[in-house]
From Swiss-Prot:
Interacts with host STAT1; this interaction mediates STAT1 degradation through apoptosis. Interacts with host STAT2; this interaction mediates STAT2 degradation through the proteasome. InterPro entries: ASFV_MGF360. The keyword Hydrolase does not apply. Belongs to the asfivirus MGF 360 family. Plays a role in virus cell tropism, and may be required for efficient virus replication in macrophages. In addition, inhibits IFN-beta-induced IFN-stimulated genes (ISGs) transcription. Mechanistically, degrades host STAT1 and STAT2 through apoptosis and ubiquitin-proteasome pathways respectively. It comes from the Viruses. Induction: Expressed in the early phase of the viral replicative cycle. The keyword Nuclease does not apply. Signal peptide: none annotated. It comes from African swine fever virus (isolate Pig/Kenya/KEN-50/1950). This is Protein MGF 360-9L. GO terms for biological process: symbiont-mediated suppression of host innate immune response; symbiont-mediated suppression of host JAK-STAT cascade via inhibition of STAT1 activity; symbiont-mediated suppression of host JAK-STAT cascade via inhibition of STAT2 activity; symbiont-mediated suppression of host type I interferon-mediated signaling pathway; taxis. It is found in: Host cytoplasm.
Amino acid sequence: MLSLQTLAKKALAKQSVPEEYHYILKYCGLWWQNKPIHLCDYCNYVIVNSTPFKGELHLDVALIMAIKENNHDLIRLFTEWGANIYYGLSCARTEYTQELCRKLGAKDGLDKKDIFISLLHHKTSNNIILCHEIFNKNPMLEILNMQDFGEEIHRELKHLIFYILDNVPINTLNKYWYAIAVKYKLKRAISFFYQTYDHLNMWRLMCAISFNNVFDLHEIYEQKIVHMDIDKMMHLACMEDDNFLTIYYCFVLGADIDQAINVTLWHHQTNNLCFCKDLKDLKEQNGLTARPLLLPNITDPKKIYTMLKNYLPISSNSR
């Protein structure tokens, strides 16, 4: 049961407090990185404005950040508010912080591979960001054997594995977590990594194309976050089969459809090949073979998804 003091702090953190009264928040310990702590009124998220990420962080993530900072008051506060301290000892940097985490219920002797696998078993924005915070800039886990994670990374990334390899293992993991966020359309995690790693914008674009995430691809293109040659974009889209959404988007932007057909042939992607041939018929307005399902010049991702969600490739031999 929460103490009266804990309940009072929680209630205060949910209020909109004018700036002239911020000293009260500071006095009550509702202060972090020179900014007031706000708690979401309807969920277990802390609203932050002082880290590289501006937005809502789950209490579990905020707790790991506080542990890595050796901020004992916040460790106690976030734990009292319901944050899970299970992984705390994996990030505690001092003996005192380690002892505090133990008293609050942290698990001893966790293996880094077990942390990685258990958190990513359920791919949510919170778990992806939490995994990132546990491993990133963590002296306790700085010696990583990428063979421990290689099978999982290769299974998820497939062809993109050739673009992720880095001499610094933690850089490889950062790219991997970003890729998972894009692949599974985890908007909160995408926003987190976009704000935290602006030098990985090209990687985000590559992931959106390769994982058929036309919604993120459209956002990147509309906001002009980063630029890539349109035929290179189409090449990436064609490398993974059934990437109809991003192939179509690249086609509408002007990618060479004949070149795309050659790429699908080279990579033996049969469904993509049939789709690219349908797009070529659409471009040439071939009424005999063009699929009535396909419409030209649509860039709205919702309309593209609706148009293609029931698309089935038909072999040219059966036409």
